[in-house]
C-alpha cells in the first residue's frame, strides 16, 4: 500500500500545486499459477499565473510604481487569476499466467558433516548423504494481461481579458474546458519457455492484444464521443539465461480498425566475454515503427483551441 501527498506554495502569486497519489499492490507466486495486480490513483491540481506582467518588476523594480513601492515575490502582478489545471487518473493493472510443465528429480551428494568428528580426527573420510528433491520445470505459459484506465483533464479560468487567446470558440470571458479518456486493454499470449531442456536455447512468445478507447470532448451544444479499437498480433524471441549472449526481439503489427497499418519492432542484444583479466560488454539496440499519432494530436476541443485532423491517419 502506498499513499503520498505533496503541496507546493509557489514563489509567485497563483502558483501553488498539490499532488495526491494512492496505490495498492498484490501478488501471488506459485509453481504453476502466478499473479501480480496494482491499483493506482492520481490527482494533481496546478494553479496558473501565466507569468509576471512585466519583467521590470524583477530587473528594474525602481521603474515600477515610480519607485514608491517595494515588491515581494508574492505581490508582483501576474497575468492570470483564478486559473487552474486539474488532472485525475486511475488505472487497474492485472497480469497472470498458468504454467504447464513436468516434475523431475534432482540428486545432490553432500558430506554428512559432524563438527565433533571433524575436530576429533579430520583424517577420517566423511560419510556422504544423497539428497533427492523434486522440482517443477515449466514448459509452456498461458498469459493474460488486462489494464483499465480512466483519465480526466479540466482547465478553468474565471476571468479572461480580450485578446488573451487567439480564439474563443464557446465563451469570450471565461473557460471551463474538460475531456475524459477511458480505455480497456487485454493481451492474451502463449509462451514456450527457455531452458526447459538443453535444446530450448531461447524462449518464444506469441500474443494478440485488443484495446478499446473512448474519448469525450466538449462541443458547442453537447459533448462528443470518439470510440476507437486497436487489434495487434505480435511475438517475442528472447534469450535471457546464460552468461555470454542475451538478446530480445519483439514485434507487433496492427490488423484491424485504427491499428491497421501500424507496426513496431524493437531488439536489443548484449555480448559478454573475457579479455585478459577483465570482462568486455557489447550492447546493441534497434527500433523501427510506423504508428498513428495519439488521439489528442488528431482531435482536441477547448474554448481556445479546436482541431480535428483526420488526414493524420494517412
How would you name each of these model-derived features?
Residues 11-18, 25-90, 275-314:
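Outer-membrane beta-barrel translocator/channel fold
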Residues 78-314:
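Exposed, low-structure sequence patches enriched in small/polar residues
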Residues 4, 40, 147:
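Short loop/turn motifs enriched for small/polar and acidic residues
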Residues 9-13, 256-258:
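A generic structural signal for short coil/turn motifs at secondary-structure boundaries
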Residues 19-20, 266:
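Amphipathic alpha-helical segments in well-structured domains
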Residues 2-6, 25:
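Predominantly transmembrane beta-strands of Gram-negative outer membrane beta-barrel pores used
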Residues 1, 65-71, 238-246:
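Active-site-adjacent bridging/hinge elements
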Amino acid at each position: 500500500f502506498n499513499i503520498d501527498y505533496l503541496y507546493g506554495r509557489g514563489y509567485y502569486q497563483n502558483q501553488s500545486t498539490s499532488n495526491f497519489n494512492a496505490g495498492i499492490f498484490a501478488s501471488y507466486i506459485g509453481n504453476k499459477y502466478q499473479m501480480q495486480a496494482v491499483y493506482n490513483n492520481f490527482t494533481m491540481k496546478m494553479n496558473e499565473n501565466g507569468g509576471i506582467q512585466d519583467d521590470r518588476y524583477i530587473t528594474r523594480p525602481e521603474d515600477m510604481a515610480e519607485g514608491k513601492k517595494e515588491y515581494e515575490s508574492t505581490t508582483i502582478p501576474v497575468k492570470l487569476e483564478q486559473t487552474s489545471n486539474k488532472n485525475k487518473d486511475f488505472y487497474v493493472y492485472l497480469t497472470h499466467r498458468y504454467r504447464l510443465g513436468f516434475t523431475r528429480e534432482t540428486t545432490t551428494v553432500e558430506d554428512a558433516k559432524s563438527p565433533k568428528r571433524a575436530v576429533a580426527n579430520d583424517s577420517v573420510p566423511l560419510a556422504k548423504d544423497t539428497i533427492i528433491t523434486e522440482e517443477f520445470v515449466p514448459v509452456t505459459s498461458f498469459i493474460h494481461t488486462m489494464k483499465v484506465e480512466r483519465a480526466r483533464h479540466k482547465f478553468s479560468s474565471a476571468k479572461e481579458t480580450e485578446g488573451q487567446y487567439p480564439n474563443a470558440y464557446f465563451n469570450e470571458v471565461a473557460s471551463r474546458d474538460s475531456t475524459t479518456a477511458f480505455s480497456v486493454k487485454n493481451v492474451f499470449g502463449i509462451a514456450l519457455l527457455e531452458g526447459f531442456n538443453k535444446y530450448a536455447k531461447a524462449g518464444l512468445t506469441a500474443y494478440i492484444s485488443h484495446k478499446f478507447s473512448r474519448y469525450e470532448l466538449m462541443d458547442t451544444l453537447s459533448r462528443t464521443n470518439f470510440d476507437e479499437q486497436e487489434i495487434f498480433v505480435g511475438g517475442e524471441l528472447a534469450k535471457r539465461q546464460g552468461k555470454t549472449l542475451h538478446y530480445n526481439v519483439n514485434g507487433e503489427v496492427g490488423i484491424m480498425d485504427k491499428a491497421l497499418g501500424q507496426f513496431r519492432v524493437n531488439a536489443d542484444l548484449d555480448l559478454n566475454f573475457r579479455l585478459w583479466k577483465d570482462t568486455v560488454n557489447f550492447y546493441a539496440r534497434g527500433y523501427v515503427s510506423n504508428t498513428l499519432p495519439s488521439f489528442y494530436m488528431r482531435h482536441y476541443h477547448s474554448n481556445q483551441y479546436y482541431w480535428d485532423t483526420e488526414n493524420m491517419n494517412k
